[in-house]
A protein has these predicted regions:
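Juxtamembrane/interface motifs at transmembrane-helix termini
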Residues: 6, 51, 93, 147-151, ...
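Short, 15-30-residue, compositionally biased linear elements
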Residues: 10-11, 189-197
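Conserved amphipathic alpha-helical segments that form helical-bundle/coiled-coil interaction surfaces
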Residues: 103-184, 195-204, 213-227
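Short, charge-rich amphipathic alpha-helical segments embedded
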Residues: 223-237
Length: 239
């Protein structure tokens, strides 16, 4: 289950291994990690590096160390923060359908609400900046992966326009979670013309300060994309 780590980035590698095992359920909530000496031997590291890694895992809300009891795994769904999302998603191989569904559901909710807020709070300068992003999507030479990233950045810019600090910090945190699935999203990208129309229609709604219209456009666009992706994996076992 555990494997020796390399000499470089020792603490980071320990964190990666233990975090991965906790997220996969190899260590369940309430389980006690092996004793420090044994765990250090299995990983092939010194105890100082192991302590550093355990401290980081505690800060993430994954484990809790108590004197006389050792280090126990916590229920991360109750104790961890949203920054854990990007680590909960595989960067290669088959996606976990449950996590993919959650990411797409969040993306739809997030896109709808930031479009609404952007229309309510946006000004002429915001419209100009959104148009600059939309112009990149209009490049006839743009490839599918670049188009997907530009479309995501359009929604990041909408978040800035909406001026909600929580949304801005949240999207900074989950950006890698979304982009880790880029290989799957690219496959189901709508045609460039559809992406451009969606972006232009949202910009027009912002110019008209029509929050409901902006939200409806974003929701329809993101719902269709999510349905296409999930329809392919429906009925297949998760990773």
């Amino acid at each position: 289950m555990l494997r020796p780590v390399g000499k470089q980035r020792v603490a980071e590698e320990i964190i990666d291994q233990l975090r991965g095992l906790i997220l996969k359920g190899s260590f369940a909530p309430g389980d006690k990690l092996p004793a420090e000496r044994r765990l250090a031997e299995e990983l092939g590291v010194n105890r100082a590096s192991l302590r550093e890694a355990i401290k980081s895992l505690e800060q993430m809300g994954l484990v809790k160390t108590r004197q006389g009891d050792g280090t126990r795994v916590l229920d991360f769904m109750q104790t961890a923060g949203v920054e854990l999302v990007s680590h909960h998603i595989p960067t290669g191989g088959k996606p976990n359908l449950e996590v993919l569904r959650d990411v797409l559901e969040f993306r739809r909710f997030y896109g709808r609400e930031v479009a609404r807020q952007a229309a309510i709070k946006g000004d002429d300068e915001d419209v100009r900046r959104l148009e600059e992003v939309a112009d990149r999507a209009a490049d006839p030479a743009i490839d599918a992966e670049a188009l997907m990233k530009v479309d995501f950045e359009f929604y990041v810019e909408l978040t800035r326009v909406g001026r909600n600090r929580v949304f801005q910090l949240l999207i900074n945190t989950i950006r890698s979670a979304v982009l880790n699935y880029s290989a799957f999203f690219v496959t189901f990208n709508p045609p460039a013309a559809v992406v451009r129309k969606n972006q232009r229609d949202i910009i027009k709604a912002i110019e008209m300060q029509d929050g409901e219209r902006a939200a409806q456009i974003a929701d329809a666009h993101l719902r269709k994309g999510a349905d296409q992706v999930l329809s392919v994996f429906k009925g297949q076992p998760s990773a």
